[in-house]
């Protein structure tokens, strides 16, 4: 990977929306599960996770829209009187009998599940601004969670608590390359290069019958130096990328047929949550991550940190039945676990990385995650990594229109082609000129490097040591903190894991001789 980029996907992040989400029944909800230990997480992470909207529910719970409006009116009335006893929360009638709690699923609109161990889950939407005013009565000390005593009132009522604004947790965040805007604030490069007029230009492009080159605008376009470092595409693995896509098309006829045959049907929000919850239980991380569903994401998913809280965003328009767990292995089993493990290491800061002379964690990070995406598929074609690599290379020599037409030989659907072209041309204003944002070549680059050295890589340590390159593992293992490290379930059986790596080599017709010659 390019030295300055260390992030998966962060093309769009609605931080202003997430900041407005509230937790119902915070007093009752924030209870730690005696069966679960968060010893592997620092107190800072716990504090940020518990105070940014993650309630202690684990099963989806949402009131109907009309009930929600009535509830908000009731809460607003109650909260305006400071010395008055709090009114009942909408769920108080059910809280008397835990067995009566039912899992209601979200209807329409985007929202967020907030989860902690041991109890049911709450789904909070932000479509209507909340008038609720909370009091501060939650405190966190050390690595444990301290709660205020219950109100002594004999009447069983529930308090609504305002969660204090969290401190940013830079250690947990992926290392983003940043630039400064005019106000001096730091900018994530992937956020800065997302066009603000994307929908408008898409409409104009489609109306022109694909002959108009979009003119993108940016909220913070002052990154010429940073963009210049990522405008050089490589052709090192171009032959392999083309071969992988051609093999896929030979077997399935078209990408669309490949997608349907191997990915399965698109999932509803209910089924997405069911799969996510099941996977989190399997990995022992239920309650540690906020899950957000959206349709406004160029990638399939992203694992980021919002206000110090690990947040998984899933693009529901691409969430397919047989591919979703692969995405979870990519985002949680790879990025999240390596990020958590990194916190305990001496190189968990920029100073530490410089002191120990660490190589960039990419392309290892994204290569490993991309392998895990296809690990258990029947036909683990590296299609997406190959198409991203190819598209970036072609973008460096073509205009937007030319690129759109060129990748039509691999992908027919115009909306899918648009997404790939935008990813390759992001950061550019006039897309009639040749030019690319080369970050997306890191996936195939990383995959092929890891496959090249798969026999010598200790994959267990590669995860346990945190955000490190496979090239640094041997020299860092003596310095590493290995107690309480988090390793995903699919790495527990080493022989099975290696068998699947061999399967990936076979299906994509990659040979050791070829990789040794290239790398």
UniProtKB/Swiss-Prot annotation:
Q: Where is this region: Disordered?
A: 63-103
Alphabetized GO MF terms: carboxypeptidase activity; metal ion binding; metallopeptidase activity
What lineage is this protein's organism placed in? Eukaryota, Metazoa, Chordata, Craniata, Vertebrata
Q: Which UniProt keywords apply?
A: Carboxypeptidase, Hydrolase, Metal-binding, Metalloprotease, Protease, Zinc
What does the entry's domain section say? Putative metalloprotease with an atypical HExxxH zinc-binding motif instead of HExxH, which interrupts the active site-containing helix without affecting the integrity of the catalytic site arrangement.
**What gene is behind this protein?**
Matcap2
Q: Any binding details for the cofactor?
A: Binds 1 zinc ion per subunit.
This protein's cofactor list reads: Zn(2+)
Top EC group: hydrolase
Species name:
Mus musculus (Mouse)
Q: Which residues form the active site?
A: 331 (nucleophile)
A Gene Ontology annotation in the biological process aspect, one of them, is: proteolysis
| Protein name from the UniProt record | Putative tyrosine carboxypeptidase MATCAP2
What does the protein in this record do? Putative tyrosine carboxypeptidase.
Q: What is its EC number?
A: 3.4.17.-
